[in-house]
């Protein structure tokens, strides 16, 4: 346990001291401690000669106590209750040594970017992966898996999306009504003629998280059959396509 000294350097009570810094008796309760440089600067002006050593010690301690009260004052906390607070609670969190994680409040939906992509002659899987990356927000340096950080993506000309190989006739889409014998199966060509938007939605949904966040992110995808879309007010920009093999070679 540290002790008080009346010399040129001062030592302060440790966390196990039963008498608090502000004069209130506390049983086995940590007290408010302060950094040495700040306290030394506060009592530097009190280094003057005195006729009595005991008087000098008392005067230095009084000035030190007043300086600490002024510097680390907590207006909303009574003086006799400040022993319950640590230095971090008095001066604020240590932001330099604490990892910061973005919260959902840091990303307002009205501030998100809007992208538009023309699906004409684009490979379905490669286009869907690019869309999922931007909806998820993985293209951002501050990406956090648990936060909605992505953008909105608009897909036009969904009926002109392309696939490679023999997927037009071999790729199957299945759905079930939930009743006995309710399994329905159709090929890529059949579904593209019936509901072309569902093909892109199915591909992107499978690349998003499975859960509440994934269901919320899926609402950021807007797919349209033709070349027009009703989101001109959002001023969408072209989706960056960096995959050189994303377009079908003719």
From Swiss-Prot:
Family of this protein: Belongs to the universal ribosomal protein uL13 family.
Keywords, comma-separated and alphabetical: Chloroplast, Plastid, Ribonucleoprotein, Ribosomal protein, Transit peptide
Cleavable signal peptide: none
Lineage of source species: Eukaryota, Viridiplantae, Streptophyta, Embryophyta, Tracheophyta
GO cellular component: chloroplast; cytosolic large ribosomal subunit; ribosome
CDD domains membership: Ribosomal_L13
Name of the protein: Large ribosomal subunit protein uL13c
SUBUNIT field: Component of the chloroplast large ribosomal subunit (LSU). Mature 70S chloroplast ribosomes of higher plants consist of a small (30S) and a large (50S) subunit. The 30S small subunit contains 1 molecule of ribosomal RNA (16S rRNA) and 24 different proteins. The 50S large subunit contains 3 rRNA molecules (23S, 5S and 4.5S rRNA) and 33 different proteins.
Record-linked SUPFAM superfamilies: Ribosomal protein L13
Transmembrane segments: none
Pfam families, sorted: Ribosomal_L13
Domain of life according to the entry: Eukaryota
GO BP term, pick one: translation
Cellular localisation: Plastid, Chloroplast
Transit peptide, residue positions per record: 1-47
Function: Component of the chloroplast ribosome (chloro-ribosome), a dedicated translation machinery responsible for the synthesis of chloroplast genome-encoded proteins, including proteins of the transcription and translation machinery and components of the photosynthetic apparatus.
Gene: RPL13
Principal subcellular localization: plastid
């Amino acid at each position: 346990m540290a002790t008080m000294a009346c010399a040129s350097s001062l030592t302060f009570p440790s966390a196990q001291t039963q008498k608090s810094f502000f004069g209130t008796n506390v049983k086995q309760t940590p007290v408010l401690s302060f950094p040495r440089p700040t306290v030394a600067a506060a009592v530097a002006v009190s280094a003057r000669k005195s006729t009595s050593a005991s008087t000098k010690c008392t005067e230095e301690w009084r000035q030190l106590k007043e300086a600490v009260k002024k510097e680390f004052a907590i207006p909303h906390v009574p003086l006799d209750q400040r022993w319950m607070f640590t230095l971090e609670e008095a001066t604020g969190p240590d932001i330099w040594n604490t990892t910061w994680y973005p919260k959902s409040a840091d990303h307002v939906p009205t501030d998100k970017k809007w992208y538009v992509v023309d699906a004409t002659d684009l490979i379905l899987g490669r286009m869907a992966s690019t869309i999922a990356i931007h909806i998820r927000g993985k293209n951002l340096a501050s990406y956090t898996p648990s936060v909605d950080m992505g953008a909105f993506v608009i897909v036009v000309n969904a009926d002109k999306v392309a696939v490679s190989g023999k997927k037009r006739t071999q790729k199957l889409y299945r759905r079930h009504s939930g009743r006995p014998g309710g399994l329905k199966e159709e090929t890529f060509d059949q579904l593209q003629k019936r509901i072309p938007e569902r093909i892109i939605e199915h591909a992107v949904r499978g690349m998003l998280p499975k859960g509440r966040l994934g269901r919320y992110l899926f609402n950021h995808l807007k797919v349209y059959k033709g070349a027009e879309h009703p989101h001109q007010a959002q001023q969408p920009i072209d989706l960056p396509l960096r995959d050189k093999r994303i377009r079908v070679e003719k």
